[in-house]
C-alpha cells in the first residue's frame, strides 16, 4: 500500500475573535497562500448592543452616557459630538468658559487615545516597554477625568448646554504641570521606536493607502491624513473655540503604517499646544447655558428653594423637548470623523440617532490593505487602524 503526500498551500485561517491582537472581538477569516494573505474578511457584530435603538427610548440627557461606551478609549470626544448636535437643534449658545473646558478635555482625550493606540500597536509588533511606560502617563490623565466628573472613564461630563460642573480648585495648575513634563515622555517614546531598525522594518511600506483610496473608502482622521490629505474638522469646520487656537495639522506622504505612527506622535505634541493655550486663555464665567429649560439649577440653589428642587427633578425625569428638526454634527475624534445624525420630532426623546463611527469605515479597508502581505503584517495593520469595537458594532 502506497501513501501519497500532498503539500497544501492554500488554506483558510480564523483570526480571532479571542486573539490578543484583535483589539476586542474581531473575527477575521483569512484566505492564505502559504504565509501570504490573499483575502481578509472581517466578521463584525459580536459587540452589538443596539445603542442607536436604545437611545430612542431615553430622554436627550439620559442618552448621553451611551456615547461614553461606544469608543471607550476616547470618551469625551463622543459626548462632545452628541452635545453639539442637541445644541444645534435647540439653537443654544454655550458660554465661552464651557467651550474652553470642552476643548481642553477633548485634547486630553486625544492624548489618552493615542498613548493607548501607539503602545498597544508596539506591543502587538513585539515592543513591550512603551506600553508599560505610557500607562503611567495615562494614569495621570485619567485622574484629571476623575477630578472633574468622579469617573475615570465614563465621565458624562460634556452635556448639552455646557459641562456638568466647573473645574475644581488646583486642577488647572496640575494640568499645566503635566504639560511641562509630558513632552519629554513623548521624546522617550520616540527614542524607543522612531529610529528603531526592527520597528521600521515592520511598519515601513506596510498597509499602504493612497490618497484616492482613502477618500473612496471614507477614511478620516489619521488614516486619511497619513495618505497626504490635509483634512481635520478642527480646521475645516471649527466648533467651539478651535478657530481661536493655534495648532498644526500633521500630514503623511507615503500612507503606510510608519507615517500613521509619526502623525499620532506629532498629534500628541499639538494637543499639548492646544491644552496650554486653553489654560492661558480660559475666561471666568458660567459653565452652563443660561436657559432654565435646558440646564438644571445649581446645588446651592436647590438646598434653599423648593421650586429649584422640583425644577431639577423635572429635568432629570421628564427631560427637555427639542423642536422638530434634524442635524448632522461631526467632531474630529482621535480616531477620525465621529458624526451624529440626530432627528427630533418635537418630543423629549430623539426620534432617530444615527452614529457615524470612523472605525467602521477603516475596518472595511482591511481587505485591500492586507492583500499580498504576510500574516504577521495583518496584526500591524489592525494596530495602525486603531480599531475599537464598541464604536464599530455599536
Curated annotation (Swiss-Prot):
- Say if the entry is tagged with keyword Transferase: no
Q: State the InterPro entries in the record.
A: NADH_Q_OxRdtase_suD, NADH_UbQ_OxRdtase_49kDa_CS, NDH1_su_D/H, NiFe-Hase_large
Q: PROSITE patterns attached here?
A: COMPLEX1_49K (PS00535)
- Provide a GO biological process annotation: mitochondrial electron transport, NADH to ubiquinone
The reaction(s) catalysed by this protein are: a ubiquinone + NADH + 5 H(+)(in) = a ubiquinol + NAD(+) + 4 H(+)(out)
State the remark under miscellaneous: A stretch of 270 kb of the mitochondrial genome is duplicated within the centromere of chromosome 2 resulting in the duplication of the gene. The expression of the duplicated gene (At2g07709) is not demonstrated. It is also probably not RNA edited and therefore differs in all the positions known to be edited.
Family membership, please give it.
Belongs to the complex I 49 kDa subunit family.
In its UniProt entry, the species of origin is given as Arabidopsis thaliana (Mouse-ear cress)
Source taxonomy lineage?
Eukaryota, Viridiplantae, Streptophyta, Embryophyta, Tracheophyta
EC category: translocase
Q: What does this protein do?
A: Core subunit of the mitochondrial membrane respiratory chain NADH dehydrogenase (Complex I) that is believed to belong to the minimal assembly required for catalysis. Complex I functions in the transfer of electrons from NADH to the respiratory chain. The immediate electron acceptor for the enzyme is believed to be ubiquinone. Component of the iron-sulfur (IP) fragment of the enzyme.
Molecular function GO terms recorded: NAD binding; NADH dehydrogenase (ubiquinone) activity; quinone binding
Q: Which GO terms describe its cellular component?
A: mitochondrion; respiratory chain complex I
The EC number(s) given in the record are 7.1.1.2
Q: Does the keyword Mitochondrion apply?
A: yes
Where would you find this protein in the cell? Mitochondrion
Q: Which UniProt keywords apply?
A: Electron transport, Mitochondrion, NAD, Oxidoreductase, Respiratory chain, Translocase, Transport, Ubiquinone
Task: Give the protein name, as stated in the record.
Answer: NADH dehydrogenase [ubiquinone] iron-sulfur protein 2
Q: How does it assemble?
A: Complex I is composed of at least 49 different subunits. This is a component of the iron-sulfur (IP) fragment of the enzyme.
Amino acid at each position: 500500500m502506497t501513501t501519497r503526500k500532498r503539500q497544501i498551500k492554500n488554506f483558510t485561517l480564523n483570526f480571532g475573535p479571542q486573539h490578543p491582537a484583535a483589539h476586542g472581538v474581531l473575527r477575521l477569516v483569512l484566505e492564505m497562500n502559504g504565509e501570504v494573505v490573499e483575502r481578509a474578511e472581517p466578521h463584525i457584530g459580536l459587540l452589538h448592543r443596539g445603542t442607536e435603538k436604545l437611545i430612542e427610548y431615553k430622554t436627550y440627557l439620559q442618552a448621553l452616557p451611551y456615547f461614553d461606551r461606544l469608543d471607550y478609549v476616547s470618551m469625551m470626544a463622543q459626548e462632545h459630538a452628541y452635545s453639539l448636535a442637541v445644541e444645534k437643534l435647540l439653537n443654544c449658545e454655550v458660554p465661552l468658559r464651557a467651550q474652553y473646558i470642552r476643548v481642553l478635555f477633548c485634547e486630553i482625550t486625544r492624548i489618552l487615545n493615542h498613548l493607548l493606540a501607539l503602545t498597544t500597536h508596539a506591543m502587538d509588533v513585539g515592543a513591550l516597554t512603551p506600553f508599560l511606560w505610557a500607562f503611567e502617563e495615562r494614569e495621570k490623565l485619567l485622574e484629571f477625568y476623575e477630578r472633574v466628573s468622579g469617573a475615570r472613564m465614563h465621565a458624562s461630563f460634556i452635556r448639552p448646554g455646557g459641562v456638568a460642573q466647573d473645574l475644581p480648585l488646583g486642577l488647572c495648575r496640575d494640568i499645566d504641570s503635566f504639560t511641562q513634563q509630558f513632552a519629554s515622555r513623548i521624546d522617550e517614546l520616540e527614542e524607543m521606536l522612531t529610529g528603531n531598525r526592527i520597528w521600521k522594518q515592520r511598519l515601513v511600506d506596510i498597509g499602504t493607502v493612497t490618497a484616492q483610496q482613502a477618500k473612496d473608502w471614507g477614511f478620516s482622521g489619521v488614516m486619511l491624513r497619513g495618505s497626504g490629505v490635509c483634512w481635520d474638522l478642527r480646521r475645516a469646520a471649527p466648533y467651539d473655540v478651535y478657530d481661536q487656537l493655534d495648532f498644526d495639522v500633521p500630514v503623511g506622504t507615503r500612507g503606510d503604517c510608519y507615517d500613521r505612527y509619526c502623525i499620532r506622535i506629532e498629534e500628541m505634541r499639538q494637543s499639548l499646544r492646544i491644552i496650554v493655550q486653553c489654560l492661558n486663555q480660559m475666561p471666568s464665567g458660567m459653565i452652563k447655558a443660561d436657559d432654565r429649560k435646558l440646564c438644571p439649577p445649581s446645588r446651592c440653589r436647590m438646598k434653599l428653594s423648593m421650586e429649584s428642587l422640583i425644577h431639577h427633578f423635572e429635568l432629570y425625569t421628564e427631560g427637555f423637548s427639542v423642536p422638530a428638526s434634524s442635524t448632522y454634527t461631526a467632531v474630529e475624534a482621535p480616531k477620525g470623523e465621529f458624526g451624529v445624525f440626530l432627528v427630533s420630532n418635537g418630543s423629549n426623546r430623539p426620534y432617530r440617532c444615527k452614529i457615524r463611527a470612523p472605525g467602521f469605515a477603516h475596518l472595511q479597508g482591511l481587505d485591500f490593505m492586507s492583500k499580498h502581505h504576510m500574516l504577521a503584517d495583518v496584526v500591524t495593520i489592525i494596530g495602525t487602524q486603531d480599531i475599537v469595537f464598541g464604536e464599530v458594532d455599536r
